[in-house]
Amino acid sequence: MTMASRSFLTDRQAEELHKSIIAYLTSLNLATTANTLRAELNLPEETFDLAKAKQYEGLLEKKWTSVIRLQKKVLDLQAENAHLKNEIENAGPLALSRKNQDPANWLPKGPPRYTLEGHRLPITSVAFHPVFSSLASASEDNTIKIWDWELGELERTLKGHTKAVLDVDFGGPRGNTLLASCSSDMSIKLWDPADQYKNIRTLHGHDHIVSSVRFVPANGTAGAGGNLLVSASKDNTLKLWDVTTGYCVKTIEGHNDWPRAVAPSADGRWLLSTGSDKAARLWDIGGTEPECRVVMFGHENFNLCCEFAPSTSYPHLARLAGHEKVPPANSAAEFMATGSRDKQIRLWDRRGQCIKVLEGHDNWVRGLAFHPAGKFLISVADDRTMRCWDLSQDGKCVQTLSGMFDGFVSCVRWAPGITKDGLAGGDAGDGTPKKKTGAEANGGVQMRCVVATGSVDGTEGKVRIFAN
């Protein structure tokens, strides 16, 4: 067996290598070593004399330096490949998905994944379906549109209201998700997603514009199995409805002017309402009759939005409030937020004390959404921005999204989370079975890092989807 047969070189390549080595040894005046190698390789001097050896001088050194340069280039390419791979992973959906397996610090960033166009007039509200990748948007063009937010496609348009649709919300009895809408035509409509969004019921009773509607979570004493719906109207009242019968079961009075917005607590026992009287009211609906427990004053103009803080935010808000103890997680109405035409956001405790004023918006604050992990509060406003406030840093504004909205931003929603048992998590609270999607957060809840906004761009309304 020859040396060539034991290598990866062809016979021709091996012969050239041997001649280069002999020429190299000869150039170093190592004649004895060169002659010994000649004999071993059976290269007699008459077939490889000094004249031919001269042709191979320097060839071995050139080959060696070429190998070194090639090796360095390979190392450089490997480093560049690793860098590019890291950039792709940091920017691509797969990497973002990996990062958001712990989504506590995820915040919406531009550009949006989708900008959904189709409404002819401003958008007033958006709402996520608790199970599927469907999103409802309400508009002043009298319609509701259903979108697939994962694909960025329009699924259908719902017509039935005769004036501007002002709010939408998904919820309802266990296993029977419904869509509720309310309008300037003074009516509330219920739509069945399982039956091609058929309008199954229209609720009448308010004497003026109905501006806000929300399903009351099923796990409270007043929840009635997820059958309750609450509405707010320019007739200065809130109403509780049984969606299975369509009857108004309670009328709640107390506001001195239009209660523009209403939100239920996660346990279904409490309601938070706010509006044109510049006050926010905390209602206990767990008893036989609703009772106003706290009235919160402080805003200097009409209030436009309100939200209960999730229990995950209690550690941050308790510190802001100067409380020595963090409230228990099963207490659902410890802290609240309101947004106003005075350009401010106010954070409140359940005693009605304002614990923090968040300032930074340059126009009316239209919508609020707490981060499910509790660390951040998201707000949108007529200054064409979305702001992110870090509650762990005394409410510091840590991010402002601007330049991507062409007009007033009227609403914002965070997609509801999903618990390990497949039921609605977070603030969705409608008891509807849900499939597991998104990253898993603490407490056995899978958090979906998806945020939707509605705005007016020119005269048209646009929905924007921000997702990991």
Swiss-Prot record:
Keyword Cell division found: yes
The UniProt keyword set, sorted, is: Cell cycle, Cell division, Coiled coil, Cytoplasm, Cytoskeleton, Microtubule, Mitosis, Repeat, Transport, WD repeat
Q: SUPFAM superfamilies in the record, alphabetically?
A: Lissencephaly-1 protein (Lis-1, PAF-AH alpha) N-terminal domain (SSF109925), WD40 repeat-like (SSF50978)
Q: Which GO terms describe its biological process?
A: cell division; establishment of mitotic spindle orientation; microtubule sliding
Question: What subcellular locations does the record give?
Answer: Cytoplasm, Cytoskeleton; Cytoplasm, Cytoskeleton, Spindle pole
Where mainly found?
cytoplasm
In residue terms, where are the WD repeats? 118-159, 161-201, 205-251, 254-293, 298-358, 360-399, 404-429, 430-468
The LisH domain covers: 13-45
Q: Which residues form a coiled coil?
A: 66-92
What Gene Ontology terms describe what this protein does at the molecular function level? dynein complex binding
Q: Which GO terms describe its cellular component?
A: cytoplasm; microtubule; microtubule associated complex; spindle pole
Per its UniProt record, what PROSITE patterns does this chain match? Answer: WD_REPEATS_1, WD_REPEATS_2, WD_REPEATS_REGION
Any Pfam family hit: WD40
Annotated family: Belongs to the WD repeat LIS1/nudF family.
Assembly notes:
Self-associates. Interacts with NDL1 and dynein.
**Comment text on domains:** Dimerization mediated by the LisH domain may be required to activate dynein.
Instruction: Tell me, in a sentence or two, what this protein's role is.
Output: Positively regulates the activity of the minus-end directed microtubule motor protein dynein. May enhance dynein-mediated microtubule sliding by targeting dynein to the microtubule plus end. Required for nuclear migration during vegetative growth as well as development. Required for retrograde early endosome (EE) transport from the hyphal tip. Required for localization of dynein to the mitotic spindle poles. Recruits additional proteins to the dynein complex at SPBs.
Name used for this protein in its record = Nuclear distribution protein PAC1-2
Source species of the chain: Podospora anserina (strain S / ATCC MYA-4624 / DSM 980 / FGSC 10383) (Pleurage anserina)
